[in-house]
């Protein structure tokens, strides 16, 4: 019964809507692509590894193209000389990446050593591509991050729904189970701190929703809070070392703040930011500097987005979205300039964007199938979200630059609550 009650609460804010397919984007950011020639130079003793090396080269080219700013190609045009060329030089298991501008000589930029671990090798290629992407564009590459999400299958009659957390690369590769709790695990949210790639999530393994700490290195989640009642929708500010979450400790689902660090854990007692006079609250998301929160409240009868200043002191929230009156799932962009969110438009839940510099709302998707849970890549120009119908849901990438969306092919099951993060701090 409790699980049904709180799944209903998620439904109020559009967290567990179930629906999407081919998608369109109605806002475009024009950026000229920079042509790049990529050449694989296989060492004289590497003939046996030729097929594998070519597959890694293809992955590298896809990684460079992912950010929609570079136009890499292994085919050199006689008519057009690209401004940059990259050579991948193999002396298996060593690989060196060299870069040349125009007709200048190649200079080594990066090197790595391959191992027997295929997954690890792919990650090394992703990280190399992102470093080169940043060097050429001064914009972070986005191929080295991981997408964590909840994967569940339809329960049999009378069974409670179960879902485990998984991680995957942007292209559907390196699919990996992160939890084995035989329960319902939802709403993972990257903390973006440290080298252990920690994330917060909610699990029902104790019967009611509680917040846990997990990581790619340790798949056994650790309970974070010892509060009565239900806690859900966690998000973290690494700048302020603050955990924001929703709890019904006082009866109403309210917004709370809790000081927290990986080394010390919970510090002090949680603070209730707003009380029941501000309606049912949900979906908090921090600004990059941790001074503000965007969240959802049904104070005026329908869920709408509000922003509240929490540092240096808590102030009165202000309404953010006046255009859309049934909104949920806000996600503040890493550059602090935009907030992605969901809103019901003509009966369909769409992905929308709020531009903080202009105060304007934009509808990003238009197809008649519900979309949910947008999460930003580190470049603030790409999103991942879930979309599908009842019993089915897939993950999609969305580019604000090209207007294009792309399905992440994973397999059967409902994929929901994606969170894009875990980017190495080396760009």
Swiss-Prot record:
UniProt keyword list: Periplasm, Signal
Keyword Cell membrane tagged: no
Subcellular compartments: Periplasm
A GO cellular-component term linked to this record: periplasmic space
Leader peptide range in chain numbering: 1-20
Record's keyword annotation contains Nuclease: no
Family that this chain belongs to: Belongs to the TolB family.
PANTHER family (UniProt xref): PROTEIN TOLB (PTHR36842:SF1), PROTEIN TOLB HOMOLOG (PTHR36842)
Protein name: Protein TolB homolog
């Amino acid at each position: 019964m409790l699980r049904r009650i709180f799944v209903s609460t998620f439904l109020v804010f559009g967290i567990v809507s179930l629906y999407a397919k081919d998608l369109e984007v109605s806002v475009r950011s024009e950026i000229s692509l920079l042509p790049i020639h990529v050449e694989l130079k296989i060492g004289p003793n590497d003939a046996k590894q030729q097929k594998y090396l070519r597959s890694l080269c293809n992955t590298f080219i896809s990684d460079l193209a992912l950010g929609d700013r570079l136009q890499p190609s292994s085919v050199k045009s006689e008519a057009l000389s690209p401004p940059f060329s990259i050579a991948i030089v193999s002396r298996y298991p060593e690989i060196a990446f060299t870069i040349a501008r125009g007709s200048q000589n190649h200079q080594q930029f990066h090197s790595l050593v391959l191992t027997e671990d295929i997954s690890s090798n792919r990650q090394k290629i992703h990280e190399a591509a992102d470093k080169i992407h940043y060097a050429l564009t001064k914009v972070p590459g986005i191929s080295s991050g991981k997408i964590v999400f909840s994967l569940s299958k339809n329960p049999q009659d009378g069974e409670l729904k179960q879902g485990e957390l998984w991680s995957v690369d942007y292209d559907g590769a390196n699919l990996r189970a992160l939890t084995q709790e035989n329960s319902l695990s939802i709403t993972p949210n990257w903390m973006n701190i440290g080298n252990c790639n920690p994330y917060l999530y909610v699990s029902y393994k104790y019967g009611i929703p509680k917040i846990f700490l997990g990581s790619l290195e340790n798949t056994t989640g650790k309970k974070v809070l010892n509060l009565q009642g239900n806690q859900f929708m966690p998000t973290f500010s690494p700048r302020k070392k603050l955990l924001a979450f929703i709890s019904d400790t006082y009866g109403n689902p309210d917004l709370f703040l809790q000081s927290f660090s990986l080394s010390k854990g919970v510090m002090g007692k949680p603070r209730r930011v707003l009380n029941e006079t501000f309606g049912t609250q949900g979906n908090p998301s921090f600004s990059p500097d941790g001074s503000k929160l965007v969240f959802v409240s049904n104070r005026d009868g329908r869920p709408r987005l509000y922003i509240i200043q929490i540092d240096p002191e808590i102030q009165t929230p202000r309404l953010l979205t006046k255009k859309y009156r049934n909104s949920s799932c806000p996600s503040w962009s890493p550059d602090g300039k935009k907030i992605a969110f969901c809103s019901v438009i003509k009966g369909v839940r769409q992905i929308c964007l709020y531009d903080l510099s202009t105060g304007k709302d934009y509808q990003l998707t238009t197809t008649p199938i519900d979309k949910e849970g947008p999460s930003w890549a580190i470049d603030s120009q790409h999103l991942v979200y879930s979309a599908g119908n009842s019993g089915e849901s897939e993950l999609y990438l969305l580019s604000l630059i090209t207007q294009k969306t792309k399905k992440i092919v994973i397999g059967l099951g409902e994929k929901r609550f994606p969170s894009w993060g875990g980017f190495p701090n080396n760009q």
